[in-house]
Curated annotation (Swiss-Prot):
The name this protein goes by in its record: Histidine--tRNA ligase
Organism whose genome encodes this protein: Vesicomyosocius okutanii subsp. Calyptogena okutanii (strain HA)
Biological classification of the source: Bacteria, Pseudomonadati, Pseudomonadota, Gammaproteobacteria, Candidatus Pseudothioglobaceae
An annotated GO cellular component: cytoplasm
Family: Belongs to the class-II aminoacyl-tRNA synthetase family.
Pfam families: HGTP_anticodon (PF03129), tRNA-synt_His (PF13393)
């Protein structure tokens, strides 16, 4: 017996019954971004591995353990993208876009990481991202928060907290890194295997550790805030003043460092307690040195990404999945002439009722079987074309969800009827 074919663990199918929610959510997000002046971009899901090594850092867990990478016959190493910013930056450099003007862009698509699959964490996951290139002012950082705040209000999200922090300039961060390493080296005996590795590769990640045994050690660690330069302090102060002006509530979390090496100054996360350990819904920050690091002209930048799977899980947890459905019609016809006429009627209805879902039965089955399919499709109305209707140049409308009694009328009247009942 052949082995049952199935998807790769941690890479999930989006089934037809769930796709309407995703399409509606994505449209809501994209429409909002566009109203704030952001333009859509698309980058390949495969990049040169070096692109991610240079952006994320070659000694990070993402690059060392989590990326899906392989070598071409030419010997060049390629990788599936584990996140979206590196590809956006590569695109900006390659096409000299920041030189033209300030770039405000958004992207969407699948990302890939070889992780242990669990609820809210998958090997293939989907993100929507916002990026601003060419603006150093904290007003750009604040605009991203304003957009997210507007999105949460639009979709009705509750119990979500904005956490913010500043990592200072790259120079301050590098100096603080040495101080942090010296501190944790004095307490190496309290660190587990992961902590010891992070001490060598990225000591900032220790500050974000979920290991409860070292929480007191972390709370006693030197604070980055005590080493900030004046420009970083002023930038963070401006950022907070914009949030205060719009009554956007936030919490300053000095342990918030973000998992990617390229961040500096402002970092932020929108978190919730409704999803257990996978609490981050949206996160990002400023990465002013990344374009230069990857070979481009020095360009300030700030961005964020939303995890769509987690956002959907949160909507479900908060019972915010809308039950409102688009008006749907199931066109039922019986007989060869009626089937041909039904195709013509369907064409007219699609033109006249562009926002209505129209199912035109393709099975050529009995009236009974077609009605059963209409019921299974959860259509609001059955549009019936039988011999009598065809001869009289009419069509019958049968409500399927207790909206009234069956009526017979001409097509023009039927179109008017549906427009009034949308």
């Amino acid at each position: 017996m052949s082995k049952k074919i199935q998807a790769i663990r941690g890479m999930n199918d989006l089934l037809p019954k769930n796709s309407a929610l995703w399409l509606s959510l994505e449209k809501t997000i994209f429409d909002l971004f566009i109203t704030y002046g952001y333009q859509n971009i698309r980058t390949p899901i495969v990049e040169k591995t070096d692109t991610f090594c240079r952006a994320i850092g070659g000694d990070t867990d993402i690059v060392e353990k989590e990326m899906y990478s392989w070598k071409e016959t030419s010997g060049e190493s390629l990788s599936l993208r584990p996140e979206g910013t590196a590809g956006c930056v590569r695109m900006m450099i390659e096409h000299n876009l920041p030189r033209e003007s300030i770039q405000k862009v958004f992207y969407q698509g699948a990302m890939f990481r070889h992780e242990r699959p669990q609820k809210g964490r998958y090997r293939q996951f989907h993100q929507v991202g916002l990026e601003i290139f060419g603006v150093f002012n904290a007003k750009a950082d604040a605009e991203l928060m304003i957009i997210m705040h507007a999105l949460w209000q639009t979709i009705g999200l509750k119990n979500i907290v904005l956490e913010i922090n500043t990592l200072g300039s790259n120079e301050v961060r590098n100096a603080y890194r040495k101080i942090l390493v010296a501190y944790f080296n004095q307490h190496k005996n309290q660190l587990n295997e992961d902590g010891l590795k992070q001490l060598k590769t990225n000591p900032f990640r220790i500050l974000d550790s979920k290991n409860k045994a070292i929480h007191s050690l972390i709370s006693d660690a030197p604070k980055l805030m005590d080493y900030l330069d004046k420009k970083s302090i002023q930038h963070f102060k401006q950022f907070k003043s914009y949030l205060d002006a719009l009554n956007i509530t936030y919490v300053i979390n000095t342990s918030l460092v973000r998992g990617l090496d390229y961040y500096n100054r402002t970092v932020f996360e929108w978190t919730t307690t409704d999803l257990g350990t996978q609490s981050t819904i949206c996160a990002g920050g400023r990465y002013d040195g990344l374009i230069e690091k990857m070979g481009g002209t020095p360009t300030p930048a700030v961005g964020l990404a939303i995890g769509l799977e987690r956002l959907v899980l949160l909507l479900e947890a908060q019972n915010l999945i809308s039950t409102k459905s688009t008006l749907s019609i199931y066109l039922i016809a019986f007989g060869k002439k009626e089937q041909i006429k039904s195709i013509q009627i369907a064409n007219v209805l699609h033109d006249e009722l562009p926002n209505v879902i129209l199912y035109n039965d393709l099975t050529l089955g009995s009236f009974k079987s077609q009605f059963e399919k209409a019921d299974k499709a959860k259509a609001n109305f059955a549009l019936i074309l039988g011999e009598q209707e065809l001869n009289n140049n009419q069509i019958s409308i049968k409500p399927l969800r207790n909206q009234g009694t069956q009526q017979t009328m001409n097509l023009e009247e039927a179109i008017k009827y549906f427009k009034e009942n949308q």
